[in-house]
Design a protein with these regions (language model features):
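Mid-to-C-terminal functional-domain signal that highlights helix-capping/loop sites
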Residues: 1-214
Length: 214
């Protein structure tokens, strides 16, 4: 089942319908309630292993390739209904990373983030950093505020899968957002609520979204 071209789930206890994109209950006994967002990383297996080489894999039997492979590659297929939208800022099937707060939403074109490698921005009141340390690394997104202080970051040349803040020189792991050296060692960056999507799908839920430009 789809709602605004996004997946709809149901819970077995109440049969309430929940949207995947924003976690809201749209029909049923729990209508109006909202699921807590648990931040995650969307990555290929190769990218995932760069940050988490000791991962345990949960694998189930199934077809050897994605059932959506053809759909993902066809730029003219936009959702089940193929609905057209008036917003022409990006091609409908452009892959974006959407970041949202209660006050605002911003889309970042994934290939632009990868080209820049590190992007710092504000989404409403939320200062964020999006990082792709290399082509073989996933894009990870963190809140830049630590203990009430907003930090700025850069990627060092001497080590992979880390970033340094320019205020204290502390070094931070991209795997979990923890400071591993420097005066802030032990401090933790929180994951920012980021969602990978096609542009048309993100627009379906956030039609007034901002679009980050390089």
């Amino acid at each position: 089942m789809l709602f605004r071209d996004g997946l709809v789930m149901y819970d077995r206890e109440t049969d309430t319908l929940w949207t995947q994109v924003d976690g809201k209950a749209v029909k049923g006994a729990l209508t109006g309630r909202k699921l807590e967002v648990v931040p995650s990383v969307h990555a290929t297996w190769k990218q995932w292993k760069q940050l988490y080489p000791d991962s345990i894999v949960l694998k189930k039997r199934g077809i050897p390739r994605s059932a959506y492979e053809g759909y993902n590659r066809d730029p003219n297929r936009t959702g089940i209904l193929g609905r057209q939208r008036g917003d022409k800022r990006l091609p409908p099937k452009e892959r974006v990373i959407g970041v949202r707060t209660e006050e605002a939403a911003t889309a970042f074109v994934e290939k632009d983030v990868r080209d820049a490698r590190l992007v710092q921005a504000e989404v409403g009141p939320l200062p964020v950093v999006l990082v792709a340390a290399g082509d073989d690394h996933p894009v990870v997104t963190f809140n830049r505020k630590v203990s009430g202080r907003v930090l700025s970051f850069r990627l060092p040349q001497d080590a992979p899968a880390v970033m340094d803040d320019t205020e204290t020189g502390s070094r931070w792991s991209l795997a979990d957002g923890k400071a591993i050296s420097g005066s802030l060692k032990g401090a933790q960056l929180a994951r920012a609520p980021a969602y990978p999507a096609f542009w048309f799908g993100w627009l379906g839920y956030f039609p007034n979204t901002a679009l980050w430009k390089r």
